[in-house]
């Protein structure tokens, strides 16, 4: 391919991207819904603080491809319901509250509280109920009784991740507002012929997000299979990772939300990347949350769970001899 052909191709791709991210007025209903769906696909695949941390937690806790896909589907269903409401508000002009007030802080706090409560529920009854000391290498001051139990008993003590909570979590997280939300709420939704059509913009956006979240959920759920663990070990690692991530991730979300509430300027601090796609256009608080919850807390919890499962299996093998 010649340099001229390459430049022409890049120009076409940039023109298409510009059309999607800056849609003109006067579009037909079908075009509006198509653009909303494509935006949803882009939203689902890019690292977003309102989707990835929660999808990671619920998906990896399901410890299977089918379970991960289910978690992504359920979470996105709640998210889709909220987006339908949001685009309806955009059509009637009530979504201007997002212009007048920064709601990121309250949403982060609420999402964090729900994550913490679910994580605490999963950890209650085992020595994992205060995982901070072990995660950060501090003094172990609580009982380690469960570490001496057979792996079947330990696995049963860490409760299964309640998939239905993912729906509620998706609905709450949907109230967060970013670049994609701006496009569907203030540009696409007002172009619909009536208020009865306005929710369809949010629904198609949610469905696009759902497609990618199902794929991402399945990917997260299969991380542990790389190490070829037994089903019992995978269950333990998945559940303990999900529980720790929700528990500690909830604290992180609530803490950052409180900071944004107290010092709103923090939410405006960002490094421009030059990429026009929302979620990739800058590195700011949202990016820090994704890295902190999924990259640091999630991966650390996964590593801890893996080491614990191997140690428990080794103990079980030794005791059986």
What are these regions (language model features)?
Residues 196, 226, 235-321:
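C-terminal regulatory/interaction regions
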Residues 4-46, 69-73, 148-176, 197-205, ...:
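Small-residue-enriched transmembrane helix starts and helix-helix packing motifs
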Residues 85-93, 177-188, 219-223, 258-273:
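Membrane-helix interface motif
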Residues 113-147, 215, 251-269, 297-306:
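Transmembrane helix exit motif
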Residues 19-99, 183-198:
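Juxtamembrane transmembrane-helix termini in multi-pass membrane transport proteins
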Residues 40-50, 120-127, 173-181, 212-216:
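Short helix-coil transition sites and intra-membrane helix breaks within transmembrane domains
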Residues 65-148:
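Membrane helix-loop-helix hairpins that form the core translocation module of multi-pass transporters
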Residues 48, 207, 254:
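Divalent metal-coordination and catalytic microenvironments
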